[in-house]
């Protein structure tokens, strides 16, 4: 008996990490299916995390695409539409604005992978020449072109999150005078506890005019930006970066009646299915659950975004797989000071109602007798009732292996005893015999 293969059409809105992961996975499992991707820009499988390094000049703009469009079209058989903006979504079809007009396309399965957009403050002057966001590859192109055509000496960055910090480094590395204006009492305050951010702030203040607890009132200039005015002063500006957060692009999902979750992003289950049959969501537009708390969270980061797309594509093609959730594992740096975390901070754990204990330690990345050792600080958060490790933060040098190991521990529900007895590698050129992460577990007690 011959098996008849039923060809399905999968439409994916968004050609970023999640969208192309979903598209590639469907084509791998169901090569005979018609997979269409509509990307509003000319950039596909792009890496927004690389924008600061293009602005700094250490990476060419074209490298922000992981694969060129031809790879997806010719090698993977994906029907990729660039500069194609989806303007309407309804049951069974989407309407798309393309270069040659508007067209409608039918779908059997639909994936929202249309990401997030910058939250631009509603103040005067944000539309002046020389004022930018740093969200997509075209932003990197525009910033570089502006710097080449105009004299830029004074840069003002509005916002003290990851993007603000990384963009500050990009301009400091080029010898620019940088002012960072932060509304809150410290940088990265939503992601890290104070004793951790204090260390990177100390480094930041050596190179940047850091203005905390100031509110930007307006941006002024005639033909182009000239200064930024806050409730505490004025700052000369030849270029301004608005790094004041992002929001999920949920407008198209609302057209279809898709449920929006409590975080403001699209609600999804473990298969990345939305509340509407045969409709999925992945990446920065979708919310998920936190591995530790089980609560709904919106964590717009590249690694989970890619995996969400993979999971969505797998389930659409009939291979069931569940997305377990996120820990919010992150890492960044300012010059030679790195900062990262995984799991819950002390602030977050207390907010969730945990009875906790914490430890904050300073260690070296090498034995005292081996050259090249650098300082590293670690903070751990533990549930008093179960001794389960809830979160780890790190700042200083060579933090990545500690944060990654801690993330694996959290995924496996490690206690402090489990962490202490983890058989980590040791040799003097790489680490001390008592690795800082093991020392942290010992100080946290078990």
Swiss-Prot record:
| Catalytic-site annotation from UniProt | 49
State where CoA binds.
Answer: 28, 45-49, 66-67, 76, 306, 362, 434, 442
InterPro entries found in the cross-reference section: CoA_disulphide_reductase (IPR017758), FAD-bd_OxRdtase (IPR050260), FAD/NAD-bd_sf (IPR036188), FAD/NAD-binding_dom (IPR023753), FAD/NAD-linked_Rdtase_dimer_sf (IPR016156), Pyr_nucl-diS_OxRdtase_dimer (IPR004099)
State the Gene Ontology terms under molecular function. Answer: CoA-disulfide reductase (NADPH) activity; flavin adenine dinucleotide binding; NADP binding; NADPH:sulfur oxidoreductase activity; protein disulfide isomerase activity
Q: Where does FAD bind?
A: 17-18, 39-40, 46-48, 86, 284, 302, 426
SUPFAM superfamilies found in the cross-reference section: FAD/NAD(P)-binding domain, FAD/NAD-linked reductases, dimerisation (C-terminal) domain
Which note does the record give on the cofactor? Binds 1 FAD per subunit.
Q: Which Pfam families match?
A: Pyr_redox_2, Pyr_redox_dim
Q: Which UniProt keywords apply?
A: FAD, Flavoprotein, NAD, NADP, Oxidoreductase, Redox-active center
Q: Reaction catalysed?
A: hydrogen sulfide + NADP(+) = sulfur + NADPH; hydrogen sulfide + NAD(+) = sulfur + NADH
- Report the Gene3D superfamilies cross-referenced here: FAD/NAD(P)-binding domain
Q: What is its EC number?
A: 1.8.1.18
Instruction: Decide whether keyword Lyase is in the record.
Output: no
Q: Which cofactor does it need?
A: FAD
Query: Do the record's keywords include Amino-acid biosynthesis?
Result: no
Family per record: Belongs to the class-III pyridine nucleotide-disulfide oxidoreductase family.
* Role, per record: Catalyzes the CoA-dependent reduction of elemental sulfur (S(0)) to produce hydrogen sulfide.
Protein name as annotated = NAD(P)H sulfur oxidoreductase (CoA-dependent)
Per the UniProt record, the source organism is: Pyrococcus abyssi (strain GE5 / Orsay)
